[in-house]
From Swiss-Prot:
Gene: ube2w
Function: Catalyzes the covalent attachment of ubiquitin to other proteins.
Alphabetized SUPFAM superfamilies for the sequence: UBC-like
Protein species of origin: Dictyostelium discoideum (Social amoeba)
Keywords of this entry: ATP-binding, Nucleotide-binding, Transferase, Ubl conjugation pathway
Keyword 4Fe-4S: no
Protein name, entry field: Probable ubiquitin-conjugating enzyme E2 W
Length: 149
């Protein structure tokens, strides 16, 4: 574990514990390599009253490399969230920036959920899930074509 990696994650973990964004709370963060974060559906959204869990896995290249972020347990039914928990969101892959933080990623995912008007899976859900099996979403080549949901 490099010192930059550890310092950055310790700072972000402390910030997330002491000043969490609305509807976001850390449930597991004792291990710097893997965190579990609870996400609650926002008031007025189609996910209001629902609770989800995100898993963040960090490599020693963080923050230069993006974390692996997936929903664990039962993922929300959403046009950009696959039934295996993989999330089609460009900032997790091609548009990652070291300026992004765990909190900002959580807020982006929460915003994506809050803006959704229909609970449906991606049209290629079955095909995608059977093709990727147990691969990390970071090993998948993503094509981003719909920013409206």
């Amino acid at each position: 574990m490099t010192s930059r990696y550890a310092k950055r994650l310790q700072k972000e973990l402390l910030d997330l514990k002491t000043n969490p964004p609305p509807c976001i709370s850390i449930t597991e963060g004792d291990n710097l390599d893997k965190w579990v974060i609870a996400v609650d559906g926002t008031e007025g959204s189609i996910y209001q009253g629902e609770h989800f869990k995100l898993q963040f896995k960090f490599s020693s290249g963080y923050p230069l490399d993006s974390p692996e972020v997936i929903f664990i347990g039962t993922p929300p039914i959403h046009p950009h969230i696959y039934s295996n928990g993989h999330i089609c969101l460009s900032i997790l892959y091609d548009n990652w920036s070291p300026a992004l933080t765990v909190s900002s990623v959580c807020l982006s995912i929460l915003s994506m959920l809050s803006g959704c008007t229909e609970k449906i899976r991606p049209t290629d859900d079955s095909k995608y899930v059977s093709r990727v099996l147990n691969k990390s979403p970071k090993e998948v080549r993503w094509m981003f074509h719909d920013d409206t949901v």
